[in-house]
Structure formats: structure tokens, C-alpha cells
Amino acid sequence: MKLLIRSEPADCEDKIFARRAYIYRMQAPSDSAAVGEALLASFRHNFQQYKTLADRALAQISPEEWLYQPASGSNSAAVIVQHMVGNLRSRFTDFLTSDGEKPTRQRDQEFAEPATVASIAALQAEWPAAWQILFMLLDELRADDLLRPVLIRGEAHTVLQAVQRQVAHYASHVGQLVQLAKIIRGDDFQSLSIARGQSQQFNQAMTENR
């Protein structure tokens, strides 16, 4: 990305702006490959953060509590995990060469509540394995893949669009898992971000650790 600047700044303020623009231009990526690699790194970072957040929320509830539904018709943690596992597998298996909605996927079954708590152990094992499919793909993708076409339900997307779509999708479901854990644990919930009333202390600690 380059910024257009005046060749002859009119005053001191313009000179300052021009200098800052020049510095930014020198520091910014100079080609699309660098931008693409930065995007892929950002995607991996975001997905890893979402998984970590979900893991920390799920660690605070028991297998029995995975089946808790806060209201009739709402999804339990088990159903949300079940759905995300199915989505991860379908979207990112053979990502570049097959439709992201696999014919073998049974999406409606992902929203069926598990019959017993005994099924939670298998679901807990499937969860990290499904995420690994995504992380392995991100390790393989390169900047020049981002504009390649892929299909989801027969609709064409670029790789960039398809991955960004899942960033938003998983963020919403991870938020649901965190909220469920907060409802279940109540006052005993261990905060996964800056605790209430602790913003100033957190900011001070960040400043001191720079």
C-alpha cells in the first residue's frame, strides 16, 4: 500500500505529514505476496484465538453440563461443538479441490442433542482433530492461493472470501460457548478476558511490561 504525498509540502504541518507518509510507505509491504502472507498469518492467529477461547470456556463445564440448554429450542455446548466439528471437516477437507459442503455431511444431525453424557467423550476427541484440518490447510496455503476459486454449495468464492466467511462464523459460535459457560458457572466463572473493574490495572501492567 502506498500513500500519495505532495512533492513540495506547503508548510510545516504538511512536511510532518509527508515525513510520516514516507516512513509508513517504507515500512509497509511492497507487494501483494507480502500482504497475502500477512493475511494468512492473521487468519491463523484469529482461528487459534477462537479455539483457545472455546477450550478455556469448555474446560469450566462438566460433561453433564455440555448437555445444558438455557431455554427450550436453544443449543447446548455439545450441539455447538458438534456443529463446528461438522463444519470444520466439511469446509476444509480437500478445500481447494472439492465443494466445501461435502455430500457426506449430515448438517441437520449436527443440531440433534446427544442422547447421553456418554457421547461427550467422543465429541471432546473430535473437536481438536477437526480444528487440526483447518490449521494444516493454513500451513499449506500461500499468498497466490488467496484469489483461487473454491465452491461452497456450488457457489464460487475466492479462497480469501471462503476463509473470511469462516472467521465470522466461528467467532459467533465461540461467543455462544463462552456465554453458556458463564451461565452455567455463574459467579464461579473464570473470566477469559479483562475482568470487570480491572481495566486500569490491566492497562498499567501492559505499559510496565513493554
Which residues make up each language-model segment?
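Acidic/histidine-rich alpha-helical segments that form the ligand environment
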Residues: 112-150, 157-171, 176
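Hydrophobic alpha-helical core bundles mediating ligand binding, dimerization, or RNAP-core interactions
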Residues: 43, 47, 51, 58, ...
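N-terminal amphipathic/basic-hydrophobic helices that include classical n-h-c signal peptides
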Residues: 1-25
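A structural signal for long alpha-helical coiled-coils and helix-turn connectors
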Residues: 58, 62, 138-142, 181
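Short, contiguous alpha-helical
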Residues: 13, 28-30, 44-48, 52-55, ...
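Short, charged, low-complexity loops and linkers
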Residues: 29-44, 112-116
